[in-house]
A protein has these predicted regions:
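Conserved residues at beta->alpha junctions
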Residues: 9-10, 36, 62
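Thioredoxin-like thiol-disulfide oxidoreductase module
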Residues: 34-52
Length: 82
C-alpha cells in the first residue's frame, strides 16, 4: 500500500530532516511540501493545528499525524522505521 505524505514546513532543520525521511520511505508514493509564507500564512497554520503546534506538521494519507515526535512514533508503530 502506498500513501501520500504532506508536510507543513517553515524550512527549519527538523522540517528538512522529516522531509528527507518521508521521501526515503518506499511506502510513500507522493510527497507534498507546503511552506509557510508561500502556501499558507503562519496564522492559518496555528488556526488549523492549534496555538501549541510546532513545525513540521505531517499528514499521511487522510490522517493528520502531528509533530515530528508524533510522526516518528507513528512510523515506528506501523513498522515503516525501526
Amino acid at each position: 500500500m502506498t500513501e501520500t505524505a504532506v508536510i507543513y514546513s517553515n524550512g527549519n532543520q527538523e522540517c528538512e530532516r522529516m522531509t528527507m525521511l518521508l521521501r526515503s520511505l518506499p511506502q510513500i508514493s507522493e510527497f507534498l511540501e507546503y511552506r509557510v509564507d508561500k502556501n499558507f500564512s503562519e496564522k492559518a497554520f496555528y488556526d488549523e493545528f492549534g496555538k501549541e503546534a510546532t513545525f513540521p506538521q505531517v499528514a499521511i494519507g487522510y490522517k493528520h499525524i502531528g509533530s515530528i515526535k508524533e510522526t516518528l512514533q507513528y512510523l515506528k508503530g506501523v513498522n515503516w522505521i525501526s
